[in-house]
């Protein structure tokens, strides 16, 4: 045989099906093809010419060494241009047909879909939107997962790094274009090959009488090889599509979570800027209006873009969903269908409404993906849900009627094409939100340098105020103290840093001017500031009228005490009133003293200004809030105890008066009857717990008399 002669039609059973290249085709293979890379789904195209065909050489110009490689799983390794004839030995004359057939049909193409759909649903259910609390703890790790596709395939493990021409594999004709991007051509149609093989085997069984003839064995082996290749190619195609679908869904869910987190941060920042006047009297951001407008534009742009994108792709997804399952998932995850209809058909202008409808539509899209019809049960659909969907999406019924017959692989390909467009929009929105991230962490020093002109300041003091700068010095010292690692002790370097900061603060404070008159103090009347219950606005507190200013108390001044005679009843009532207001007066003096110190040290002026909560950390705010709540709770508890004690003594006095009236005792007789050793006003009653003893003693005295 010469070197330029073509090989024979059949050198070994079945080898010519996947080892020979047809030189008659000039532009490559033009049947159904698949392309695989890390970002794009495999596309199945028919009778189309790819632009990278021009880089391939003609099969007649290829050498056998450039086509056949050892990493190809189904090609017989050979460095010769032709295959030598194979002689069947006696050991292979009686081989086991059952073992061969079982190995051929071991990997069923349709079994991949069910395994994939379980992982598909699990990834969506454990996402950030449907399982907010525990999504980070419910990651799925399987030994046999769709995501292990690259690990399980010997061919994909050994992909050459550069472009190579066509290689024949059991998955189809393979070409590596660039950056390990694979192009597959599926040259066996699964269904047509199975049907044709079944018909041929039926005819052979009917007309072939010699069951052990060599020719019959060659034909059967040829048919089995064709069936095996068609099964492998269909299995590979379905497996690859499921893998790319799950990969794209996870990327979309991750991008949705990132965008949702950024939108939430911007929304919180927007609320802080808008409501800062209700939290504090001091505004730390001089360009708050400009920042609020930028944040609002970002939120409106992001919410509107994502909402209308979801509104355009959901009608294409919901036609593949089972309406019965969709209604169950909507009920499970709290999606109100009338509310969905309202937000999808009406125009929303406020920002909160835009964010709410976006969140609602994202959850509904995930419910549609969870309820994909994998069994083709169109007769078991929910009529009420279908009618509602027809109202929400006017062309829903028309799309359902135009939908092709049940084909899960085709459904996944359509879903992935829709999610690819959504993922590109999410990436754009995320980039835009990240570009303006500095607004989330804007401080007064940063915002003041960004503006060239001075703006009207809503603060009662300017940014150049000496007290404000001193507070910033203290804040830096506090941060340095918190940064010290106390486990290793305070080092000399840490000590020097703190001392330098303190010296700078002392120098600054000495050079600054003392402004304002701090000698005047004000005292709030306790009669006008009685706390009637628990006030909800803890940060703001209750407002009380200011009393006129008084002079400072002199401790050296002599105080004259006047003795006043009083009766028994009057003394008892006065003692009760003194006990009732004793604690409260003490608290008022303490609070007045603290307010006085606060005015002197913090402001240096007459008016009392509340501390700035924006300069405090989360732990400090939480600590101040807890202290305020505990203080108010203690005041309420003490007030209730004083009121209960006063009522109890009032009942005691009424019982004593009624007993004297009932028996008609005069003054001396009453004294003899009750055998009182001293007046009741002189009896020291420490608390309410002593009242039952008084009742019991009076009862005993009454029985003895």
From Swiss-Prot:
What Gene Ontology terms for biological process does this UniProt record contain? peroxisome inheritance
Family per similarity comment:
Belongs to the INP2 family.
UniProt keyword annotations, A-Z: Glycoprotein, Membrane, Peroxisome, Receptor, Transmembrane, Transmembrane helix
Q: Per the UniProt entry, what species is this protein from, by scientific name?
A: Saccharomyces cerevisiae (strain YJM789)
Query: What would be the name of the gene that encodes this protein?
Result: INP2
Localization: Peroxisome membrane
What the protein does comes down to: Required for peroxisome inheritance. Acts as the peroxisome-specific receptor for the myosin V motor MYO2.
What is the annotated quaternary arrangement, including any partners? Interacts with MYO2.
Which sequence ranges are marked TM in the entry?
215-231
Sugar-modified residues: 79, 275, 343-344, 379, 517, 569, 574
Recorded protein name is Inheritance of peroxisomes protein 2
Query: What is the membrane topology here?
Result: Single-pass membrane protein
GO annotation, cellular component aspect: peroxisomal membrane
């Amino acid at each position: 045989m010469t070197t330029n002669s073509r090989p024979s039609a059949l050198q070994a059973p079945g080898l010519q099906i996947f080892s020979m290249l047809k030189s008659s085709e000039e532009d490559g293979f033009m049947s159904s093809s698949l392309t695989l890379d890390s970002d794009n789904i495999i596309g199945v195209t028919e009778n189309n010419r790819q632009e990278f065909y021009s880089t391939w050489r003609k099969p007649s110009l290829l050498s056998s060494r450039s086509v056949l490689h050892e990493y190809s799983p189904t090609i017989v390794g050979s460095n010769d241009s032709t295959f030598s004839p194979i002689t069947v030995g006696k050991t292979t004359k009686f081989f086991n047909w059952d073992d061969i057939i079982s190995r051929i049909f071991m990997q069923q193409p349709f079994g991949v879909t069910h395994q994939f759909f379980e992982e598909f649903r699990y990834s969506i259910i454990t996402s950030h939107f449907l399982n907010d609390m525990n999504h980070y703890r419910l990651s799925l790790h399987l030994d046999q997962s769709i995501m292990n596709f690259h690990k399980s395939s010997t061919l994909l493990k050994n992909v050459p790094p550069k472009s190579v021409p066509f290689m024949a594999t059991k998955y189809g004709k393979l070409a590596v274009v660039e950056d390990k991007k694979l192009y597959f051509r599926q040259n066996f149609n699964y269904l047509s090959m199975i049907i044709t093989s079944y018909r041929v085997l039926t005819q052979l069984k009917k007309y072939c009488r010699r069951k052990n003839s060599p020719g019959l064995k060659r034909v059967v082996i040829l048919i089995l090889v064709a069936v095996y290749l068609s099964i492998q190619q269909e299995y590979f195609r379905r497996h690859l599509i499921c893998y790319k679908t799950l990969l794209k869904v996870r990327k979309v869910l991750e991008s949705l979570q990132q965008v949702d987190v950024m939108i939430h941060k911007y929304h919180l920042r927007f609320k802080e800027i808008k409501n800062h006047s209700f939290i504090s009297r001091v505004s730390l951001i001089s360009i708050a209006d400009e920042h609020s407008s930028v944040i609002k534009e970002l939120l409106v742009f992001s919410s509107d873009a994502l909402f209308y994108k979801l509104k355009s792709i959901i009608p294409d997804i919901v036609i593949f969903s089972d309406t019965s399952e969709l209604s169950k998932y909507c009920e499970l995850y709290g999606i109100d269908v009338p509310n969905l209809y309202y937000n999808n058909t009406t125009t929303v202008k406020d920002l909160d409404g835009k964010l709410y409808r976006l969140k609602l539509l994202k959850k509904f899209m995930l419910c549609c993906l969870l309820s994909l019809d994998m069994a083709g049960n169109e007769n078991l659909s929910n009529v009420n849900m279908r009618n509602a969907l027809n109202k929400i999406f006017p062309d829903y019924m028309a799309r359902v009627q135009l939908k092709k017959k049940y084909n899960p692989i085709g459904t996944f390909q359509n879903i992935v094409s829709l999610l690819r467009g959504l993922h590109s929009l999410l990436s754009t929105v995320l980039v835009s939100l990240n570009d303006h991230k500095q607004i989330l962490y804007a401080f007064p020093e940063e915002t003041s340098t960004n503006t060239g002109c001075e703006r009207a300041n809503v603060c009662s003091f300017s940014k150049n105020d000496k007290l404000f700068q001193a507070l910033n010095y203290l804040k830096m010292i506090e941060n340095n103290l918190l940064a010290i690692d106390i486990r290793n002790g305070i080092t000399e370097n840490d000590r020097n840093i703190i001392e330098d900061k303190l010296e700078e603060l002392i120098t600054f404070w000495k050079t600054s001017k003392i402004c304002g008159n701090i000698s005047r103090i004000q005292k709030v009347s306790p009669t006008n500031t009685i706390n009637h219950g628990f006030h909800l606005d803890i940060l703001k507190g209750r407002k009380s009228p200011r009393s006129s200013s008084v002079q400072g108390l002199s401790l050296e001044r002599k105080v004259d005490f006047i003795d006043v005679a009083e009766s028994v009843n009057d003394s008892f009532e006065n003692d009760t009133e003194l006990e009732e207001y004793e604690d409260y007066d003490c608290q008022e003096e303490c609070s007045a003293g603290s307010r006085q110190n606060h005015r002197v040290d913090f402001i240096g002026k007459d008016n009392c200004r509340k501390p700035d909560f924006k300069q405090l950390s989360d732990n400090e705010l939480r600590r101040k809030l807890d202290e305020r709540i505990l203080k108010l709770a203690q005041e309420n508890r003490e007030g209730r105890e004083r009121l209960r004690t006063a009522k109890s003594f009032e009942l005691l006095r009424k019982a004593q008066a009624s007993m004297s009236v009932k028996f008609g005792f005069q003054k001396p007789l009453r004294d003899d009857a009750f055998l009182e050793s001293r007046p009741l006003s002189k009896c020291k009653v420490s608390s309410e717990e002593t009242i039952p003893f008084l009742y019991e003693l009076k009862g005993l005295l009454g029985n003895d008399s």
